[in-house]
UniProtKB/Swiss-Prot annotation:
Signal peptide: none
GO CC annotations on file: cytoplasm; endopeptidase Clp complex
Organism: Anaeromyxobacter dehalogenans (strain 2CP-C)
Gene this chain is encoded by: clpP
InterPro entries in the cross-refs: ClpP, ClpP/crotonase-like_dom_sf, ClpP/TepA, ClpP_Ser_AS
PROSITE patterns: CLP_PROTEASE_SER (PS00381)
Protein's name according to its UniProt entry: ATP-dependent Clp protease proteolytic subunit
Keywords: Cytoplasm, Hydrolase, Protease, Serine protease
Reactions it catalyzes: Hydrolysis of proteins to small peptides in the presence of ATP and magnesium. alpha-casein is the usual test substrate. In the absence of ATP, only oligopeptides shorter than five residues are hydrolyzed (such as succinyl-Leu-Tyr-|-NHMec, and Leu-Tyr-Leu-|-Tyr-Trp, in which cleavage of the -Tyr-|-Leu- and -Tyr-|-Trp bonds also occurs)
SUPFAM superfamilies for the chain: ClpP/crotonase
Length: 203
């Protein structure tokens, strides 16, 4: 994979020039960007950012932008639980794609504050993974996978207001949606062309 240099932003302050990497500068505006697969390292960074922004201002919304193919279920659940735990409401915005755990996090934003741009793609499916080891270990892992699957479906049903039976059926295979279809499904609340459309939503 080619090396992509980190963009920096230079600002003038009363103490002179100050430079920020682009993600730190966005964080100043309460913007968090998830633009990679979800794993423990990514989850730890996003959780730390959520907790930091809560400490900075517990009453001001946080904006989580998502362009992710998904990833680890446990890592994603750690981010999701933190989104629900912090006092600020977390608005989610899909750019590009929100697939698998990315779609789960998109749906987990604050009610009325979940968005996607018109050409975004959203995909939900059941968790996947291979089991290895002795027969008893495989049985234990399979039971845990079924428990996690049921938990994810339950949470998704609550956020989308879809019957649990439909969530179970639709996630049996990859289920792709356009931004408009995701709105009808209840994964997001609105589709917008311009940022000002999201800014007009009630705080």
């Amino acid at each position: 994979m080619p090396y992509i240099p980190m963009p920096y932003v230079v600002e003038q302050t009363h103490r002179g020039e100050r430079s920020y990497d682009i993600y730190s500068r966005l964080l100043k505006d309460r913007i968090i960007f998830l633009g990679t697969p979800v794993d423990d390292d990514v989850a730890n960074v996003i959780i730390a950012q959520l907790l930091f922004l809560e400490s900075e201002d517990p009453d001001k919304d946080i904006n989580l932008y998502i362009n992710s193919p998904g990833g680890s279920v446990t890592s994603g659940l750690a981010i999701y639980d933190t989104m629900q735990y912090v006092k600020p409401q977390v608005s989610t915005i899909c750019l590009g794609q929100a697939a698998s755990m990315g779609a789960f996090l998109l749906a987990g934003g604050a009610a009325g504050k979940r968005f996607a741009v018109p050409n975004a793609r959203i995909m939900i499916h059941q968790l996947s993974g291979g089991f290895q080891g002795q027969a008893t270990d495989i049985e234990i892992q399979a039971k845990e996978a079924l428990r996690l699957k049921a938990k994810l479906n339950e949470i998704m049903a609550r956020h989308t207001r879809q019957p649990i039976e439909r969530i179970e059926r639709d996630t049996e295979r990859d289920y792709f949606m356009s931004a408009g279809e995701a709105k009808e499904y209840g994964l997001i609340d609105d589709v917008f062309l311009h940022k000002k459309a999201a800014d007009k939503k009630p705080q």
